[in-house]
Amino acid sequence: MSRNLDSPVQTQMAVAVFKTPLTGASKMEGKQHHKHQHLQRQSSGRRVFVQTETGCVLGMELDRSDNVHTVKRRLQIALNFPTEESSLTYGDMVLTNDLSAVRNDSPLLLKRNFMHRSSSTPCLSPTGRDLQQKDRSGPIEILGHSDCFSIVKHMVKDIVKAMKMGVEPLPVHSGLGGAYYFRNKRGESVAIVKPTDEEPFAPNNPKGFVGKALGQPGLKSSVRVGETGFREVAAYLLDYGRFANVPPTALVKITHSVFNVNDGVKGNKPREKKLVSKIASFQKFVAHDFDASDHGTSSFPVTSVHRIGILDIRIFNTDRHGGNLLVKKLDGVGMFGQVELIPIDHGLCLPETLEDPYFEWIHWPQASLPFSDEEVDYIQSLDPVKDCDMLRRELPMIREACLRVLVLCTIFLKEASAYGLCLAEIGEMMTREFRPGEEEPSELEVVCIEAKRSVTERDVFSPRSDVVGEAEFQFDLDCDDLESVYSSKIQLTDDYFTKNPFSNGRSSLGKLEESIKEEEEDEEEEEDKTENTVPMIIMKDSFFSSAAFHDKAPSLSKLSTSMKNTHLSDTTRKNPKPLTRGKSENTSSGHKSANEQLPVSASFVKVADMKEDEWVLFLERFQELLGPAFAKRKTATLSKRQRLGTSCQF
């Protein structure tokens, strides 16, 4: 079974639902659906959730004799959904026929194979009457059986009781995606639920930010639409012992009429609300007084800032702003003025490639203080190999590229803390430096580029031919047009579109160029090039020729690893203008096409294109290069003027 690192994403979307105890089934059916589910699991051992790229979801039991064809057939009968010319994917894996690799409670994605697809297919109502096609699950089902989800299980019971009593969830009006407060029978918020198909630019986004199918680049090109949910869960699972205080989080299949389902053709909201099932992140609601953007940072505990920063570095958080750091006042004797910090919203962590992270705490005075002995011990106890094994076990849909970023960042954190760097210094080494009109790789990325070059130069002496399949191009060909693969440079905040520092939606990027070229041309000549010219443009971090694209270009992995003939340009050229369509697919008023909203950003380092032996060599060389990089950073820090607030006492 072939692995496809760039195959469509493994998250779930809005779903047409079959009869359940809450959809009008008889009381007897409601009492027996759990028994039916138990008997089915005894015979098959596996329950999976199959969804289409536009949001329709169906839970089904797998028998030993089932294969990809039978799964597609069930989906076609149950949802009246066409399955011809489609692929069934499981994370990075494209399933051809055998389903033995699919684990219990796993989400699968059914995706059409057309090169140019619209996201206009509506979520159709089910028509199948056969018991085998019915989704007889309860209103909330947890995907996974980790002991870490025990708190979530109790929350689910409270919410289900409230749902049966008629307590309605409350939509969250802030943010760019769909989110809902689910309450207990007393009307108190218990959990915040974020359906994966209501993310920004996903098909059923309730706030007008539509235009993408599941698996296409989202707010960040390195985080695909529909995949933020399992990242939220990953952050919780990696926060061992609640070290950073991440609230309990799980991935669930949840059924309710409050969820949004857009008209698939025009993106309009239907007038009539119907019960739909969705895959969503399910996080414990934490009562708080305000968030970090509304409060001065001087009262924040050093330990809390350090612990949250350690987590952010491990998971390469690209969106740690003040709005997703909740602040809760601590009451009690001797607790005057003390607060507790709760980190939330980790959907943009663990990207598939390195890009520019955002750490709100990087200039806080607490971040400039040394780590405590306890914090250093915790960092040194981290084992990225065990972390990856755990995530593969609990979140089988997670991509290997995300796990490689986790390994890279954990090694970087361990080595940096052992060298004596503080949190602020580590964060600065991971953050890119912006100058007017250009963007340069971070110090971490520079080390990765050099390590990758070393591996490539070693491979030159033992060249080998690689068989390139169409699967390597799946992710790129899934995009409606070339514009879709440009990286976004958006911070996930409500006021982004009014306060974006690059107000024209575009920034000139530092660019990887060919080191051997016939002549150097100036920027104006580059802009005036004719259509016959073959410009080299940055797509993710690979060189990609537009002409080669039409000729079925060679492997992206080969091109991106061949860095021996490349160098970081001394001059920065303007980004090529993205291709535009004549008309957006979502033309209804109030809806914003994803292609119209995403500005361009660069990705200098891609880790997914290395084979296993190359990855091992890369990590060895990476660790060798860290010492000189840390020494350079220390020298630069000492030569700088003392940071404002460093002398504050806590």
Swiss-Prot record:
Residues 166-463 form the PI3K/PI4K catalytic domain. It catalyses: a 1,2-diacyl-sn-glycero-3-phospho-(1D-myo-inositol) + ATP = a 1,2-diacyl-sn-glycero-3-phospho-(1D-myo-inositol 4-phosphate) + ADP + H(+). Residues 508-534, 560-595 are annotated as: Disordered. Residues 343-369 are annotated as: Activation loop. ATP binds at residues 173-179, 194, 283-286, 345. Residues 516-529 have a biased composition (Acidic residues). The modification Phosphoserine is found at residue 593. CDD domains: Ubl_ubiquitin_like. Keywords: ATP-binding, Kinase, Nucleotide-binding, Phosphoprotein, Transferase. Residues 316-324 are annotated as: Catalytic loop. It holds the Pfam family PI3_PI4_kinase. This is Phosphatidylinositol 4-kinase gamma 7. It comes from Arabidopsis thaliana (Mouse-ear cress). The gene is PI4KG7.
